[in-house]
Amino acid sequence: MRRLLPLLDHFRRDRAGNIAVIFALTLVPMISVAGGGLDYIRATAIRTKLQAAADAASVGSVAKQSPAFIAAGTMSSDGTIAAGVADATNIFNANMSGITGYALNGLNITVSRVNGVVTSNVQFSADVPMMFLGVIGKS
């Protein structure tokens, strides 16, 4: 920071105008690139949290003591396990409570028994609004 202040003072004192014009012209793209990087980091962090919540919901809904596993043991044939879907939804929502900065567009959860095996699939879709790139019209 100490090196930056004399440099900025030099730009301010320069009366030729070339430096100030070039600096002004390059400032907008530089800020846009830096802001885009921050938006990307934020979106990636939210995607990671959503994926972790989906993984926890998928695994937790078919754990040995889960409602889905217990219900699958009482089923006489293969099919969807409603208790598992509800349990997975609760696990996903619990993991994402308190996390902001995204809009969940869709959450598709299936928990079923096929050939005696309990399987779970959790898919989600979400939008993360861009803060810095939104200023220049990018979404």
Residue ranges and their predicted role:
Residues 131-139:
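Short, ordered "entry" segments at domain starts
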Residues 2, 37, 41-49, 56-130:
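Short amphipathic secondary-structure patches
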Residues 18-21, 34, 55:
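Alpha-helical structural signal
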Residues 16-28:
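N-terminal signal-anchor/signal peptide hydrophobic helix marking the start
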Residues 1-16:
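N-terminal leader/signal peptides at the extreme start of proteins
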Residues 27-37:
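Single-pass alpha-helical transmembrane signal-anchor segments
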Residues 11, 19-20, 40:
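N-terminal transmembrane alpha-helices
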